[in-house]
């Protein structure tokens, strides 16, 4: 994932900055507790494709 792209992407729900989880290829919105997938180096910024974070995952990402 190109870090210059990360600097301009925000959560489509609340416009918050996103945290890049390189290991799991996810973009995390801590505010909305959503994880957007990255597929073939392309962020999928559709709310319908986002995964709601579990309580354990929320704690992991802070």
Swiss-Prot record:
InterPro entries: Trm112-like. It comes from the Bacteria. GO terms for cellular component: cytosol. It holds the Pfam family Trm112p. Belongs to the UPF0434 family. This is UPF0434 protein Fphi_1862.
